[in-house]
Design a protein with these regions (language model features):
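Hydrophobic structural patches
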Residues: 16, 43-46, 136
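N-terminal leader segment of winged-helix/HTH proteins
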Residues: 1-33
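N-terminal helix-turn-helix DNA-binding core of bacterial DNA-binding proteins
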Residues: 25-65
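C-terminal regulatory/oligomerization modules of transcriptional regulators
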Residues: 1-4, 127-150
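N-terminal positioning helix adjacent to the helix-turn-helix/winged-helix DNA-binding module
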Residues: 8, 23, 38-39, 101, ...
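Charged, amphipathic alpha-helical coiled-coil/dimerization segments
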Residues: 74-134
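Alpha-helical linker/hinge and terminal dimerization helices associated
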Residues: 16-19, 23, 27, 62, ...
């Protein structure tokens, strides 16, 4: 990689990582007491994607280990935010669905983060945010794609 390209890559990832850290910090402060970012992320995903998901599907979606997802799901189940049931077709698998309490918790979390997100969008401008989203999606897609074998 050329020196200019290397500097560009370092700048890009430095900005992405710094923004990620700041977003996580601000979200953690405004989420309802006891709710972690991982909890909100899973609840939001389940609310958007109707139907059930397996823990393995959720782990893959969030790019975490199955153990980490199991820990998050156990906490959400304990709080009454999700239902976990056996898969009737394959007893080795479980199925996860959001509960009515989980929908309410997710809605409360959205209400608590909306002012913070709205402020950021207002300062940056809606058009600039919209024009940035496709680039961020492409970056995410590039980073999530599996490396091709040699």
């Amino acid at each position: 990689m050329s020196t200019d390209k290397n500097a560009l890559a370092i700048s890009l990832f430095s900005e992405v990582l710094a923004a990620d850290q700041m977003v996580r910090n601000r979200l953690s402060r405004v989420l309802p007491k006891g709710m972690e970012i991982s909890h909100f992320s899973v609840l939001n995903h389940l609310a958007w994607h109707e139907g059930e998901r397996t823990p393995a599907q959720l782990a893959e979606t969030f790019n975490v280990t199955r153990g980490a997802m199991t820990n998050t799901l156990n906490r959400l189940e304990w709080a009454g935010y999700i239902h976990i049931r056996p898969d009737w077709d394959d007893a080795r698998r479980k199925m996860v669905a959001i509960s009515p309490a989980g929908l309410r918790a997710r809605d409360q979390a959205l209400s608590s983060i909306a002012p913070m997100v709205g402020e950021v969008i207002d300062k940056l401008g809606e058009d600039r945010v919209r024009s940035t989203l496709p680039i961020l999606r492409q970056l995410r897609d590039q980073l999530s794609s599996k490396p091709k074998p040699d």
